[in-house]
Amino acid sequence: MIAILLAVAFGITFTLFTTPFFIRLFRKIGWGQFIRLDGPRQHAIKRGTPTMGGLVIVVASIISYFLANFFLGLSVEPSGLLVIFMFVGMSLVGFLDDILKVRKQHSGGLGPFYKVVLQSFIAVPFALLTFLVKDARGIPHSSMSISFARDTGINFSALFSLGIIGVFSAWILYLLWINLIAVSSVNAVNITDGLDGLAAGAMIFTMLAYVVIGFWQSGQNCARKSLPLENISKCYSVNGPLDMSILAAAILGSLLGFLWWNTNPSKIMMGDTGALALGGAAAALSILTHTQLLFLVLGGLFVIEAGSVILQIAFYKKYRRRIFLMSPLHHHFELKGWAEITVVVRFWIIAGLFTALGIGLFYADWLYS
């Protein structure tokens, strides 16, 4: 618990006190935000606001994670490093997108196709590493089961019994599944990052959930020798859950400090550099804690935001009419007359409620297992 609190404290301190320096630096080198021309007119004043603040979040989170472990003499575990791999990898994709926007002086960076391809180049190696990297007992960090609050009976490895074709099919399905989780997550967070502080505040709740989940899984881990006899049937086969909890806490703290400068009116924006990184970290945590489907609840706001875009496009293509005044959903409410800060705070409340529901479902699964 002390390591978790330290990680939060380090994260807050780093971003709270260093972000002003990066605001000045990014403004000086011309890393300014470009606003979509078809967006709400009141967003035009945000043009030129320093962007790529996600760099601050990523660096602060990683430093805070290592410092928290170092101060308490804890070993950095492969589970945390795997999350960092996805965190940094997706951040680099976002950084490339942001750099292209700055150089082209346009709100369009990487095209959708190239963005998904690059995201897949991060997600697929991550999926392979979760099996290739094993703990001290020789157990991989992931399984081929689809998970909710723990692994379910849906297991791609059941295809192994079909011989070489079955083994090949199982691996392809597993890689596609992990890629779907990762790509969906990073793009959902990116879609949500359209108002000052919205994505950062919502992700704080998601990271809080993974702090709680990782800490609980650590106490109820199957590898613990001191586990009460009555809890053995409920234990979690998760590698390094406490380490992931510490990393989630570091990200949470970094977001809290960053939000001080990112809230309306924003002095700096995280850009795709931050949004893709956060989506990648959340996806990695859901995979490594075996809570893949539960992530749909924990990140419910991101699901709604991404879903509003999908619905808008599909409905318009079929009926030539729009469901919303504008998608994503937060822009719809802006055009309905809601103030930006009103939309953000109400969406934060929704994100918090989804997180509470998700943690409740997680605990209920343990209670009734």
Curated annotation (Swiss-Prot):
It is found in: Cell membrane. It is a multi-pass membrane protein. Its cofactor is Mg(2+). It comes from the Bacteria. PROSITE patterns: MRAY_1 (PS01347), MRAY_2 (PS01348). GO terms for molecular function: metal ion binding; phospho-N-acetylmuramoyl-pentapeptide-transferase activity; UDP-N-acetylmuramoyl-L-alanyl-D-glutamyl-meso-2,6-diaminopimelyl-D-alanyl-D-alanine:undecaprenyl-phosphate transferase activity. Pathway: Cell wall biogenesis; peptidoglycan biosynthesis. The keyword Acetylation does not apply. The keyword GTP-binding does not apply. One of its GO terms (cellular component) is plasma membrane. It catalyses: UDP-N-acetyl-alpha-D-muramoyl-L-alanyl-gamma-D-glutamyl-meso-2,6-diaminopimeloyl-D-alanyl-D-alanine + di-trans,octa-cis-undecaprenyl phosphate = di-trans,octa-cis-undecaprenyl diphospho-N-acetyl-alpha-D-muramoyl-L-alanyl-D-glutamyl-meso-2,6-diaminopimeloyl-D-alanyl-D-alanine + UMP. Keywords: Cell cycle, Cell division, Cell membrane, Cell shape, Cell wall biogenesis/degradation, Magnesium, Membrane, Metal-binding, Peptidoglycan synthesis, Transferase, Transmembrane, Transmembrane helix. Its EC number is 2.7.8.13. CDD domains: GT_MraY. The chain crosses the membrane at residues 2-22, 54-74, 80-100, 113-133, 158-178, 195-215, 241-261, 268-288, 293-313, 347-367. Coiled coil: none annotated. Catalyzes the initial step of the lipid cycle reactions in the biosynthesis of the cell wall peptidoglycan: transfers peptidoglycan precursor phospho-MurNAc-pentapeptide from UDP-MurNAc-pentapeptide onto the lipid carrier undecaprenyl phosphate, yielding undecaprenyl-pyrophosphoryl-MurNAc-pentapeptide, known as lipid I. Belongs to the glycosyltransferase 4 family. MraY subfamily. HAMAP family: MraY. This is Phospho-N-acetylmuramoyl-pentapeptide-transferase.
